[in-house]
Amino acid sequence: MRQILFRLIGILEVAGGFYGMATVLPRLLGSGPLHAAVIQLIAFALYTFTLVAGVLLLENSERGIRFSSISQLLQLPLIATPIFSYAFYCGACVNVALVLHLPPRPELTWHFGNQGLLLAVGGPSASHLGLNLLALLSWLILKLR
């Protein structure tokens, strides 16, 4: 069972990392201002790291487990405030968030076969704080081997 779950996590990391790299590369090459290029470079590095972590995990290496754990921790938080925003997912995500507006309300979003990175100074007027439950579950599976 452990091997099947590790393979599933690895496949999602490889697919999401490759898709993210393929999506970001044209924007990286065509980005204009320096701050846009820096964010695209960070995105490219995160997707590359996740792809490498997935490949190493599929090879059943100890380094793959460690890198995949780091990748899952990077995908865990969802922070969107008027001052700063960060969210990263690669392959799939199930986000549970609390929208801090009057009245506060929970929010559930999910994506499969997709990638995304939100890294910005600034964000929505109604703050969102949440967790990627799929990343949390994957991290726990990797830690409780």
Language model segments and positions:
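Topology signature of small-to-medium multi-pass alpha-helical membrane proteins
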Residues: 1-145
